[in-house]
Amino acid sequence: IFEIPMGSHFRIHNGKIFKKIALRVKRYECLEISSGRLYLFQPNAEVELLPN
């Protein structure tokens, strides 16, 4: 996740789609598109980048 640009959309293994927002100390704050909830991701989490 640390390799994708800020503001881009990505998908995790279970199909949920998120938008990368900000860096909080060591973890990345991301917004789930469908529910609007915020989640924190470890920098080495494997995600699939989606075209905007």
Q: Language-model segments: which ranges?
A:
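Structural motif
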Residues: 13-14, 34
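Mixed-charge, Lys/Arg-rich low-complexity intrinsically disordered regions
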Residues: 1-5
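Short, isolated positions in well-ordered beta-strands
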Residues: 10, 17-18, 39
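A broad helix-preferring feature
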Residues: 7-10, 30
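Short beta-strand-centered aromatic/proline hotspots
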Residues: 15-25
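Intrinsically disordered, low-complexity, charged/polar segments
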Residues: 38-52
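Short, solvent-exposed secondary-structure boundary/capping segments
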Residues: 26-35
